[in-house]
């Protein structure tokens, strides 16, 4: 037993602890974001997976979905930036606002993927998602079938976080936060 071996063990344990803590915080953020935008952890997990495969970070996707949720609600009331964009895409804001988020995104993606000039897609994405819209052009261009395929792949790979698992991780993270606050 040498000092080098002991030090390597300590460094490894600290690294593993930090990795676990980061994983817990990421799951906690997923659950809190899902709750904030009125969706499930399962739906948000699938949407994040599809976004990641098309080059969009989870942070960007989360902000885009928050803005899309708000703008869709405004459009359903007859106001806001998204009103004209949704109409141009042939989507009914009042119907969209009553759908689960993943269904809203599937309907939007299907309408968005229809042949239109790239500049028009970009302009529509900005109206629907604000500045995060540019990042989502490739995700939306997949269409309903492409997104559904990615959702199924996420389930197959086990990257979809259940509500029960997310709730348990949130409790663990809250307990760790309290512990480290003392």
Locations of regions flagged by a protein language model:
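Amphipathic/coiled-coil alpha-helical interface segments used
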Residues: 1-7, 23, 32, 116-182
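Alpha-helical transmembrane signal-anchor/signal-peptide segments
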Residues: 25-37
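Membrane-cytosol interface motif
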Residues: 38-44
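Solvent-exposed, membrane-proximal periplasmic/extracellular interface segments of envelope transport
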Residues: 63, 67-106, 110, 114
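Secretory-pathway/luminal and periplasmic proteins that interact with or process carbohydrate-rich
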Residues: 56, 73-77, 134-138
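Conserved binding/catalytic microenvironments
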Residues: 47
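Short, glycine/alanine-rich hydrophobic alpha-helices that insert into or span membranes
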Residues: 1-25, 103
């Amino acid at each position: 037993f040498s000092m080098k071996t002991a030090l390597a063990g300590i460094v490894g344990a600290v690294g593993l602890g930090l990795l676990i803590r980061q994983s817990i915080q990421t799951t906690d953020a997923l659950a809190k974001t899902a709750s904030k935008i009125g969706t499930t952890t399962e739906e948000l997990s699938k949407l994040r997976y599809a976004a990641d495969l098309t080059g969009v970070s989870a942070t960007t996707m989360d902000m885009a979905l928050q803005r899309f949720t708000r703008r869709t609600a405004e459009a359903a009331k007859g106001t806001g930036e998204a009103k004209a964009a949704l109409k141009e895409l042939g989507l009914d804001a009042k119907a969209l606002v009553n759908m689960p988020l993943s269904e809203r995104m599937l309907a939007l993606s299907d309408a968005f993927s229809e042949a239109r000039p790239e500049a028009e897609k970009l302009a529509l994405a900005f109206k629907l998602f604000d500045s995060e819209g540019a990042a989502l052009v490739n995700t939306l261009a997949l269409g309903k079938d492409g997104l559904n395929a990615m959702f199924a792949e996420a389930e197959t790979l086990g990257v979809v976080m259940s509500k029960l698992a997310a709730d348990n991780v949130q409790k663990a993270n809250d307990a760790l936060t309290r512990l480290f606050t003392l």
